[in-house]
Amino acid sequence: LYNTLNSIKWMATIQHATGIAEMTISLSRLLKSVSKGNERLVPLQEEFALLNDYFTIQQYRYGGTITLDVIWIEDERLCQDCMIPRFTLQPLVENAIFHGIEPKGCAGSIELTIKTDKETGDVLILLTDDGVGMSDEQAKQILTEPSAEQAGAKFRHVGVWNVHRRLQYSFGEDYGLSVDAQLGQGTTVTIRLPGNYDKKENET
């Protein structure tokens, strides 16, 4: 499969189809990340690289009408020191695009803010979109376990709930997601991660 993607990339390069070449490179890296099943947790820096590959593909799909900005409030060393379950950010950004920005029918933006909780030392990642938002009831439902019927129908909150549960499985009940939204004004999903997680635990 990788050889096939590489062939597509070179054909696109020869024909000066830059967009196709870049999307193919990003897809190849994403597939390699999926195949890495031996590491449950990865440095935040690696997770952002994966997210960048995913977003590159989406930018071409939406003609550059969606932007993704990363804002660092604290030291960028958080990227190396903080550990996060692989494929945590991508499903949340995907949800923001498909269920937040796309339904409003115009350009949109997603902002990632990384900071530390001064009281606990935890790392907080705030993912904010300017999409259609949701009601308080919908925001509460997102973090509740979906029914079998909802899971089969791929309801909006299934992917978000899965991310929430993986975070709690990895770090404990004190960690995971929280959702703050206003109907018609966008949504903010906050990821809480331990700031001093022992990387050696990931090897067991």
Residue ranges and their predicted role:
Residues 2-178, 188:
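Two-component histidine phosphotransfer core
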Residues 177-204:
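C-terminal end segment of the histidine kinase catalytic
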